[in-house]
UniProtKB/Swiss-Prot annotation:
Pathway: Amino-acid biosynthesis; L-lysine biosynthesis via DAP pathway; LL-2,6-diaminopimelate from (S)-tetrahydrodipicolinate (succinylase route): step 1/3. CDD domains: LbH_THP_succinylT (cd03350). It catalyses: (S)-2,3,4,5-tetrahydrodipicolinate + succinyl-CoA + H2O = (S)-2-succinylamino-6-oxoheptanedioate + CoA. This is 2,3,4,5-tetrahydropyridine-2,6-dicarboxylate N-succinyltransferase. Homotrimer. It comes from the Bacteria. GO terms for cellular component: cytoplasm. The lineage of its organism: Bacteria, Pseudomonadati, Pseudomonadota, Alphaproteobacteria, Rhodobacterales. Belongs to the transferase hexapeptide repeat family. It comes from Cereibacter sphaeroides (strain ATCC 17029 / ATH 2.4.9).
Length: 274
């Protein structure tokens, strides 16, 4: 089935979603399963870059949500001390053997979790971390210990998600775009990027930077305040701005801009020094 045919079938299924159950068969089930398989293999993405802009395939997000209706809850094996879990989404690695691992070409350290329909590209390293369904993690990216990649999040090439980083998931509301980290970004430990925000290519976020749609992102040099997007090549640290009543409120501060040449010659710690 072509992607245009899949899209039409998913849109029709979405309109009749209340009728979809684990007993559903035929074109509806086939379209949902084919879409989830395409996401899992990386041939389809929830969002794709076209020029400088990101286009969201809302129908692919709908397929992810519809997938929950096709399965009942069931025992998931593999827990500590022969324990189990109770869920309706399979592991990406279910029934994988040596051949599948070699073909996939990424490294998955014990106790990392990746749910089916998430794509992991070649050269990725997954420390004990969590990658949710519909996400896309591109080549040679490091997902460090306790980092979380939320549902449908898009992570670029050569990205470093440091320990404890949270990249937010966006399945609902349906019109919302996914959280996006573009190529060659460094996200410092325990930072959070959520609510469909975009960190543009080559940016560096220091430790403990939190960015949501309502977070002020302040360019220290120009005084410009922006929301929802970190410009390419930005070096960002946590800061604060004066507010009413003499109280300072949190913001993210762009302390400098760097190009790829500077990044290649300068350590992350040097970039973050004020």
């Amino acid at each position: 089935m072509s992607y245009s045919a899949l899209e039409a079938a998913i849109e029709a299924a979405w309109e009749a979603r209340e009728t979809i159950t684990p007993a559903t068969k035929g074109e509806t089930r086939e379209a949902i399963e084919a879409t989830l398989e395409a996401l899992d293999k990386g041939s389809l993405r929830v969002a794709e870059k076209r020029g400088a802009d990101w286009h969201v395939n809302q129908w692919a997000k709908k397929a992810v949500l519809l997938g929950f209706r096709l399965k009942d809850m069931e025992v998931q094996t593999g827990g500590p001390q022969a324990g189990t879990w109770w869920d309706k989404v399979d592991s990406k690695f279910a029934q994988w053997g040596e051949a599948q691992w070699k073909a996939a070409g990424f490294r998955a350290v014990p106790n990392c979790i990746v749910r089916r329909s998430a794509y992991i590209a070649r050269g990725v390293v997954l420390m004990p971390s969590f990658v949710n369904l519909g996400a896309y993690v591109d080549e040679s990216t490091m997902v460090d210990t306790w980092a979380t990649v939320g549902s449908c999040a898009q992570i670029g090439k050569n990205v470093h998600l440091s320990g404890g980083v949270g990249i937010g998931g966006v399945l609902e509301p349906m019109q919302a775009g996914p959280t996006i980290i573009e190529d060659n970004c460094f996200i410092g430990a325990r930072s959070e990027v959520v609510e469909g925000c975009i960190v543009r290519e080559g940016s560096v976020l220091g430790m403990g930077v939190f960015i949501g749609k309502s977070t002020k992102i302040v360019d220290r040099e120009t005084g410009e305040v922006m929301y929802g997007e970190v410009p390419a090549g930005s070096v960002v640290v946590a800061g604060s701005m004066p507010s009413k009543g003499g109280v300072n409120l949190y913001c993210a501060v762009i302390v400098k801009r760097v190009d790829a040449q500077t990044r290649s010659k300068t350590s992350i710690n040097e970039l973050l020094r004020d």
